[in-house]
Amino acid sequence: MSKDNIRQYSAPVYDGIENAPARSMMRAVGFQDKDFNRPFIGIASTWANVTPCNMHIDGLAREAEHGVNQASGKGIIFNTITISDGISNGTEGMKYSLVSREIIADSIEAVIGCQGYDGVIAIGGCDKNMPGCIMGLARLNRPGLFIYGGTIQPGEGHTDMISVFEAVGQYAKGEINAIQVKQIEEVALPGPGSCGGMYTANTMASAIEALGMSLPGSSAQDAISEEKRQDCHRAGEAVMNLLRLDIRPRDIMTKAAFENAIKVVIALGGSTNAVLHLIAMAHTAEVKLDLDDFVRIGQETPVVADLRPSGKYLMSELIKIGGIQPLMKRMLERGMLDGSCLTVTGKTLAENLAEVEDYPADQQIILPFEQPVKKDSHLVILKGNLSPTGAVAKITGKEGLYFEGPARVFEGEEGAMRGILDGEVQEGEVVVIRGEGPKGGPGMREMLKPTSAIIGKGLGQSVALITDGRFSGGSHGFVIGHVTPEAYEGGPIGLVENGDKISINAETREITLHISNEEMSLRRAKWQKPEPKYKSGALAKFAKLAAGADKGAVTDLNLDV
C-alpha cells in the first residue's frame, strides 16, 4: 500500500501486515482495497436535532464526504457535540455553553489524533461550534478547513430569535399579551440555520472566512441552498489540494490573518464573543493576540454594516447582495486588509478577491466608509479600577458614549432577571451581574435574557449593564462584559455595593468605580473567596482550568507540563 507523503498519518495506522486488524475494522464499515491507498480525511460533523442551527448538517457532511471521495481521498464522517445557547440562555444549562467550545476542540483533536486521519474538514452551525472547530484544527495542525452550516431564513414579519427574547420583556412591560408572545414564538424561526443577525454564529463564520480558514463565500450562504451544497462539495477538493501543497492551519492562521479577521468583525458590527474566541483560537495556533490588539485595530476600523442586533438588516439580506466578499475587497482596496495572507484555497486573500464584484449601487446594508455607522470600533476595550485587566463593551454609538449611575448589584443572572422584570431596576442605574465569570459561574454565561428584558421594558437607552459573564451576539444596549479579573478571583467587580457610582467612558475607554482607594482596600480585606459551585464533572474541570476572559478562557494555558 502507498506510503506517499500525503498519507503521512494514515499509513502508520493502516499499512502493513501488522495493521491488518485496523484494516479489518474499516472493511466492516465499507472500505475496499482501493480506499486504503487514499488519504483519509476526517469530517467532523456537529449534526444534532437539538437546535435548528445544526439540524441539517448531516446532509452537509455527506456532501463534503462525496467531494473528498471524488477528489481521490477517502472521507470518514464522525460527530462532535453541539449545544444551543438559544435554548439554554438564562438557565443553569447555559454554564455548559463555553465549556462546549473546549469539548468540541478536544473531541476533534482526539478523533483525528487517534484514528490517523491525514486531513480534516470541520462543519459547524451554532455559536461555539466555530471556535471549537478551528481550535481542534489548529491543535494537531493537519491540512484542513472549516465549513459554516449557513444562516436561517427570517421569520414572519422580519422576526428572528432575538425578537422572541425581547417579546418577553415587552410582555413584562404590558405592551403585548401572552397570546402575542406565542404568535411571535411560533413564526420567528422557520427552519434550519444559525440565528439570522450578525450575532455570534454569523460573526465567527465571517471571522473564519476573513482568517482564510473557510472557502470564499462560505460565511454568507443560506443553510438550505444550492450554494451551501456546492460549498461542501468544493471543500472536499480544497482539503485534497491543501494536502498536496502541504498547507496547514498554522500556515494560514498568522498574526496578520487574525488582524484581518478582527477588522472584518468590526466592520460588520459583530459580536463581543469574537474577542474571546479569536484570542482563544490564536492561543491554540501559537499566535500572540490580546486585548491591546483590539484597541489598536479598533481605533482605525469603522463599523459600516447596518445589521442586527444594533442595526436593521438580517444576514439573509446581506447574502442577497453578495455577502462579505465585496466588503473585504473594499477593505483590501483601502489598505485595511493584508492581501498577502494565505487561505485554504492555496491562494492569497488578494487573489481570492481579485474578481469579486462590488455591491449593487442601491443597497443600504453596507455603508460607505465615508459615512460609517461608527467611525471606529463598536467593540470597546475598557480598563480602570473596576476592570484592571480589561473588559469588553459593545457600543455602537446609538446608546451614547458615556454612562454614569448608581450600581444595582445582583449575584448571578437569575436574580438580575427577576429584578428587571419586577421593576426593581430603575432608569439611570448600572446593573452589575457578578459571579458569572469563567471560574465563578462557572462557564461565563451569556446575559441575553437580562439585556433582552431591559430592551423589552424600554430601558435600553437609560440602563447600563456590567458583568464578568458574556453577552450573546444578539445583545445590544449599553453593555459591558468580560470584566477581569472576575469576582470569583477577587476582582473589583466583586467589591461593588448597591448605590456605588460607576462611570463608563467609551471615548477614553475607562470604567471607573467611584470609591476611594482606602474604601476599596477595606472591602478587599473583608472579601472571602466563594466555595466552588461544582466539585466534579465538566463544569468543575472547566472552573479549575479556565483562564481569564482576557486570555480567551482557554483551558490549556496554565498547565504544569
Curated annotation (Swiss-Prot):
Residues recorded with modification N6-carboxylysine: K128
Segments crossing the lipid bilayer: none
MF terms (GO), sorted A to Z: 2 iron, 2 sulfur cluster binding; dihydroxy-acid dehydratase activity; magnesium ion binding
EC number, as in UniProt: 4.2.1.9
Pathway info: Amino-acid biosynthesis; L-isoleucine biosynthesis; L-isoleucine from 2-oxobutanoate: step 3/4; Amino-acid biosynthesis; L-valine biosynthesis; L-valine from pyruvate: step 3/4
Binding site for [2Fe-2S] cluster: C53, C126, C195
Active site positions, chain numbering: S472 (proton acceptor)
Keyword tags: 2Fe-2S, Amino-acid biosynthesis, Branched-chain amino acid biosynthesis, Iron, Iron-sulfur, Lyase, Magnesium, Metal-binding
Name of the molecule in the record: Dihydroxy-acid dehydratase 2
Reactions catalysed according to its record: (2R)-2,3-dihydroxy-3-methylbutanoate = 3-methyl-2-oxobutanoate + H2O; (2R,3R)-2,3-dihydroxy-3-methylpentanoate = (S)-3-methyl-2-oxopentanoate + H2O
Signal sequence bounds: none
Binding positions (Mg(2+)): D85, D127, K128, E446
HAMAP family: IlvD
PROSITE patterns: ILVD_EDD_1, ILVD_EDD_2
Biological process terms in GO annotation: isoleucine biosynthetic process; L-valine biosynthetic process
Keyword Iron-sulfur attached: yes
Disulphides: none
Stored InterPro entries: DHAD_IlvD/Edd, Dihydro-acid_dehy_C, DihydroxyA_deHydtase, DiOHA_6PGluconate_deHydtase_CS, ILV_EDD_C, ILV_EDD_N, IlvD/EDD_N
UniProt gene name: ilvD2
Family: Belongs to the IlvD/Edd family.
Note on how the cofactor is bound: Binds 1 [2Fe-2S] cluster per subunit. This cluster acts as a Lewis acid cofactor.
Subunit structure: Homodimer.
Function: Functions in the biosynthesis of branched-chain amino acids. Catalyzes the dehydration of (2R,3R)-2,3-dihydroxy-3-methylpentanoate (2,3-dihydroxy-3-methylvalerate) into 2-oxo-3-methylpentanoate (2-oxo-3-methylvalerate) and of (2R)-2,3-dihydroxy-3-methylbutanoate (2,3-dihydroxyisovalerate) into 2-oxo-3-methylbutanoate (2-oxoisovalerate), the penultimate precursor to L-isoleucine and L-valine, respectively.
Named cofactor requirement(s): [2Fe-2S] cluster; Mg(2+)
Primary enzyme class: lyase
NCBIfam families tied to this protein: ilvD, PRK00911.1
